[in-house]
């Protein structure tokens, strides 16, 4: 699993320190990445191994696909890496400098400030918002199936449900009337992020190209959603002495040691609107896909709803919403015996780590029972790892498990075709063309 020929240097005096594809052109590789990034990464990994260097000039660029390599980057060397990469810079065009994209200096105090909003008592209280969201969804499904089974787009249904729950649990507001507009704006904005990442000639957002104008209109709609959310809560904000406060209470607290600016508040709200519902919706959509294409597992879940956590955990392994995690190295260090120079771009791929036989038996199989003895410390990174582990992980797992358990108990959910659904490797993993399923109320 090594290259037949390894040059000493690539263009612009970039040293070669690890195996990787050679002999091709940058343009050829770029076309392959744009066409089908997941297949391209899998092919490169299978041919060259767990640490791969791409044939590009500066910055030196590496793909890390092993459990140990991922841990080295995300945990052991987290102080020697930065989020100042193209991936997060493009995402910041939408979210601003929120918790997801902020670099270490800005991130650390913000994480400390927001952590109380994700303590166990707040996570427990979020169950109420999951129940409310599910009740609304089931009323809608009952109306849709009054005349018999009907076909719905499960991807869109999970997007809308996750957004309502996120806004209720984190911000204490009901945005039911705005759900369609906010989800559409989110998808449009994220599509712009991906388009920019795949186009090295993309012009700055301030240049009024049709694509840039479309993306800016979507961002403006997200800004309007922030205004709506704050206005809806302004008259009902809990005092700083309240025993339990949600995230919006914390953000709007004027008595913070360093009160947040309007821009900082906006950035955090948009970050959690986007990340808080997009990732959960993606995980749920693929969980349903795995269930409807594995009827035996669907039956097990219907008979034992407590298996929902296992199903969701396995779905996150096979279809991790964040399929790549990037870092810029601040100093030189080694990964799996290979030198990674300072100022390199490192790409950790949960998609590949979760398919690595060093951590998983039968890695391509949907086997929820593999998690009956717990979640492994090494090789499972759908929420990242280390200091930058997703702050909303526990809330997302609770929310997703409740949704899978209840809907599987109350509804027959079936695939309408047996063909494999292609994956769109966008900011998160999404099904191309949605996820059509047939639903009917269980008698």
Give the positions of each predicted feature:
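Conserved cytochrome P450 K-helix E-x-x-R motif and the immediately C-terminal K′/meander segment
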Residues: 29-49, 224, 305-336, 357
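N-terminal membrane-proximal hinge/A-helix region immediately C-terminal to the signal-anchor transmembrane segment
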Residues: 2-105, 109, 128-136, 176-177, ...
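Cytochrome P450 catalytic-core helices
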Residues: 279-302, 394-411
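Cytochrome P450 proximal C-terminal region
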Residues: 10, 14, 45, 134, ...
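Conserved cytochrome P450 K-helix/beta-meander segment immediately N-terminal to the heme-binding cysteine loop
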Residues: 348-374
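Cytochrome P450 heme-thiolate monooxygenase catalytic core
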Residues: 2-18, 82-88, 106, 122-282
């Amino acid at each position: 699993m090594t290259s037949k020929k390894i040059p000493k240097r690539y263009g612009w005096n970039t040293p070669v320190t690890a195996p990787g594809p050679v002999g091709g052109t940058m343009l050829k590789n770029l076309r392959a990445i744009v066409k089908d990034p997941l297949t391209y990464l899998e092919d490169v990994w299978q041919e060259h191994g767990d640490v791969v260097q791409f044939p590009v000039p500066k910055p030196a660029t590496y793909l890390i696909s092993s459990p140990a390599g991922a841990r080295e980057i995300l945990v052991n060397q987290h102080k020697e890496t930065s989020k100042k990469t193209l991936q997060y810079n493009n995402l910041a065009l939408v979210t601003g400098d929120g918790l997801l994209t902020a670099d270490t200096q800005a991130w650390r105090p913000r994480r400390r400030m927001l952590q109380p909003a994700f303590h166990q008592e707040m996570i427990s209280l979020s169950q109420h918002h999951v129940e409310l969201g599910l009740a609304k969804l089931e009323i809608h499904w009952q109306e849709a199936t009054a005349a018999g089974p009907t076909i719905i787009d499960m991807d869109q249904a999970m997007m809308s449900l996750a957004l309502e729950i996120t806004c209720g649990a984190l911000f204490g507001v009901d945005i039911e009337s705005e759900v369609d507009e906010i989800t559409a704006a989110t998808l449009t904005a994220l599509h712009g992020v991906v388009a920019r990442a795949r186009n090295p000639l993309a012009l700055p957002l301030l240049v009024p190209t049709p694509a840039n104008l479309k993306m800016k209109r979507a961002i403006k709609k997200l800004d309007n959603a922030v205004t709506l959310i704050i206005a809806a809560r302004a008259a009902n904000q809990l005092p700083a002495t309240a025993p339990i406060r949600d995230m919006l209470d914390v953000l709007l607290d004027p008595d913070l040691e360093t009160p947040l600016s309007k821009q900082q508040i906006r950035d955090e709200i948009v970050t959690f609107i986007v990340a808080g519902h997009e990732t959960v919706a993606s995980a749920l959509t693929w969980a349903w896909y795995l269930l409807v294409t594995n009827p035996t597992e669907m039956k097990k879940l219907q008979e034992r709803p407590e298996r929902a956590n296992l199903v969701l955990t396995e779905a996150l392994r096979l279809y991790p919403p964040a399929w790549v995690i990037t870092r810029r190295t601040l100093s030189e260090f080694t990964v799996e015996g290979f030198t990674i120079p300072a100022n390199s771009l490192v790409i950790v791929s949960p998609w590949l780590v979760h398919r690595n036989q060093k951590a998983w038996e039968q890695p391509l199989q949907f086997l929820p029972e593999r998690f009956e003895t717990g979640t492994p410390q090494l090789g499972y990174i759908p929420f990242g790892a280390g200091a930058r582990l997703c702050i909303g992980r526990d809330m997302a797992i609770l929310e997703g498990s409740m949704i899978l358990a209840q809907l599987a108990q109350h509804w027959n959910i079936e695939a309408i075709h047996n063909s494999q659904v292609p994956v769109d490797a966008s900011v998160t993993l999404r099904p191309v063309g949605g996820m059509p399923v047939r639903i009917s109320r269980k008698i």
